[in-house]
Structures are given as C-alpha cells and as structure tokens.
From Swiss-Prot:
Coiled coil: none annotated. Interacts with CDC20, FOXO3 and FZR1. Associates with microtubules in primary cortical mature neurons. Homotrimer. Interacts (via both phosphorylated, unphosphorylated, active or inactive forms) with HDAC6; the interaction is necessary for the complex to interact with alpha-tubulin, suggesting that these proteins belong to a large complex that deacetylates the cytoskeleton. Interacts with FOXO1; the interaction is disrupted upon serum-starvation or oxidative stress, leading to increased level of acetylated FOXO1 and induction of autophagy. Keywords: Cell cycle, Cell division, Cell membrane, Cell projection, Chromosome, Cytoplasm, Cytoskeleton, Membrane, Metal-binding, Microtubule, Mitosis, NAD, Nucleus, Phosphoprotein, Transferase, Ubl conjugation, Zinc. The active site is at H150 (proton acceptor). CDD domains: SIRT1 (cd01408). It comes from Pongo abelii (Sumatran orangutan). Its EC number is 2.3.1.286, 2.3.1.-. Its cofactor is Zn(2+). One of its GO terms (cellular component) is mitotic spindle. This is NAD-dependent protein deacetylase sirtuin-2. The gene is SIRT2. Residues 339-352 have a biased composition (Basic and acidic residues).
Length: 352
C-alpha cells in the first residue's frame, strides 16, 4: 500500500516544477552550497575515471581501455578475465594482468586527495568506490570511510568454501611478482584477491551502509564513473529528492527516463538539461581538473595542492627506503563464509 501511495504521489508530481536546491545549477552554485550550514555530510561515488591520471586504465575507453588491450592473454572474450568460472580453470591471465595493475605501483590522484580533504574537514560521510586499486586507502581514507563495492586487493581469500583462509596484501604481492599462481597454504586451492568477479557476491557492507547513509546525505558527489554497472549505478537514486548531486566526469552519465526509473524503483536518474532540472550539476572534463576547480571555489586549492605534493613525496621516500605499508603485513587468518544476504553480481557487473 505504501508503494502504491508513493507511486501515485510521484506520478502526479512528475509534471510539477520543483524548487531549486542550489542558487544556480553550476559548479559555483555547488561550492556556495558546500560552504553553507546545509551541507554537512557528503557521499562520494567514484569509478575508474578518478584513477586514470595515476596511470591505471579504465575499462571502456576506446583503444586505451582495459578491455581493448587484452589480446595478449588469448581470452575467449575480454570479460572472461573477471569471470569466476574462467578464473578457477585458467587463473594465469588474471594474475598476469594483476602484476601490471598491482596496488602500490601508483600514486593517488588529485581526486583521491580531494576526498581526503573532505574527510579532514569532517564533511565526508562515505566514499563508495567501484575501483579495486586501493588508492583511496593510500590517500588516507580509512576502512570506516569506504565502501569498496567491487572489492579490493587489500585482502585475499582461498576460493574453497570449506577453507576461506585469508591472506594479506604483502603475501599476494610476493606471489604475483614472483609469477607464482597463489595457492592456499592449508588446502592448495587457488587464492584470489577479494575483488568481485562476475557471479560473485557484492560485499554485505555495500547494502548495510547504503540503507543508512543515503537517509542523511546532504550532497552526492559522483566522479569518474559511467554509471552503467548495477547495482552501483542505482545509488544516485537513493539520495533524497532534496539532495543536490554533482557529476564530475568526461561525459554526462546517469541520465534516464524519469517515469520508467520511478516505476522500476530506481529513481529518475540525473537531469542536467531539462527545464525541470533543479538539483543536478555536470562539470565535464578530467576529474582532477574538476576537483581543482571546485577546490579553488571553496578556497581549498593551495591546501589541496600542498597535500598532494606532501603525500606524493612521502610515498616516494617510503618506496626508496623499501618501507612496507604496515597495514599490509597482517598474518593470514580464517574468515567465515560470505553472509547469505549478499547479493549476486549481474552479468553487467565488473570491477571498474
């Protein structure tokens, strides 16, 4: 009954003009909103586009995207490299690719450090990331700040359901760079980084955090994602209708038919251009440049540039001294099987 009442109410309001939530639908309008008392909790939704300036390819860009450059692995089709059934039979292509993309070879970008500033200023409610490169962690976001929707290289587990032995980042790194297929020390089954493959469950944390976070968000900041992968893409519709949404991306994303989206329970998508637009802003270009532009409007530009410079210098110093990340040296341990309420990935879901 509540669904029907809500559906009827939304249907009647489709043609009504909502009051704008920003004084203008521009980056400047978003900046002024962020400086007001109304903006206290920001959720970031991020994808591969925030890491490309670090040298990590995205998945879909023509010629330079990951899926256009997998010929050397002789896969039956590009997506097979992230299919759990193919991985269990032929793990070598994935681990060869993992060596090229392994965390620790790249530095966080301006986008990552902009989110760090949001955290330091007490504005970051949560970062939901599709990325598996752990750059958010390297930039200073902590476990509590993150929802790694498509998993992470940070930990790995034995694929045997009866074992599930856990291994730290340092253990997996040694195996990958030695070009040794990682095998469990207990049962000799394959060990896989905790990234979400086709046919695997999303982390339960994705759903538990989503249910509470989006009830209290004041601003949704979407960066570097095509918003094509479900259920991550549906997160933009979880924000209340009274919450502004800013997209920083090379092209517009997340737009959909409002009536169809409402019927399917996935909201109306982004509306940047219609006469009824009232809360959505798109800044088109490189994500780093978008964050710099926003930081300048907020009066944070020098602080952001200094943070990037200081943190990159620290990473370089640690690399030169061979200092390991202390958070990657934990001992292997057992983990319980995944929770039963974790949802399965769809065919379109893939690490991004």
């Amino acid at each position: 009954m509540d669904f029907l009442r809500n559906l009827f109410s939304q249907t009647l309001s489709l043609g009504s003009q909502k009051e704008r939530l920003l004084d203008e639908l521009t980056l400047e309008g978003v900046a002024r909103y962020m400086q007001s008392e109304r903006c206290r909790r920001v959720i970031c939704l991020v994808g591969a586009g925030i890491s490309t300036s670090a040298g990590i390819p995205d998945f879909r860009s023509p010629s330079t995207g990951l899926y256009d450059n997998l010929e050397k692995y002789h896969l039956p089709y590009p997506e097979a490299i992230f299919e759990i059934s193919y991985f269990k039979k032929h793990p070598e292509p994935f681990f060869a690719l993992a060596k090229e993309l392994y965390p620790g070879q790249f530095k966080p970008t301006i986008c990552h450090y902009f989110m760090r500033l949001l955290k330091d200023k007490g504005l970051l409610l949560r970062c939901y990331t599709q990325n598996i490169d752990t750059l958010e962690r390297i930039a200073g976001l902590e476990q509590e700040d993150l929802v790694e929707a498509h998993g992470t290289f940070y930990t790995s587990h034995c694929v045997s359901a009866s074992c599930r032995h856990e291994y730290p980042l340092s253990w997996m790194k040694e195996k990958i760079f030695s070009e040794v297929t990682p095998k469990c020390e207990d049962c000799q089954s394959l060990v896989k980084p905790d990234i979400v493959f086709f046919g695997e469950s999303l982390p339960a944390r994705f759903f538990s955090c989503m249910q509470s976070d989006f009830l209290k968000v004041d601003l949704l900041l979407v960066m570097g994602t095509s918003l094509q992968v479900q259920p991550f893409a549906s997160l933009i519709s979880k924000a209340p209708l009274s919450t502004p949404r800013l997209l920083i991306n090379k092209e517009k994303a997340g737009q959909s038919d409002p009536f169809l989206g409402m019927i399917m329970g996935l909201g109306g998508g982004m509306d940047f251009d219609s006469k009824k637009a009232y809360r959505d802003v798109a800044w088109l270009g490189e994500c780093d440049q978008g964050c710099l532009a926003l930081a300048e409007l907020l009066g944070w530009k020098k602080e952001l540039e200094d943070l990037v410079r200081r943190e990159h210098a620290s990473i370089d110093a640690q690399s030169g001294a061979g200092v390991p990340n202390p958070s990657t040296s934990a001992s292997p341990k057992k983990s319980p099987p995944p929770a039963k309420d974790e949802a399965r990935t769809t065919e379109r879901e893939k690490p991004q």
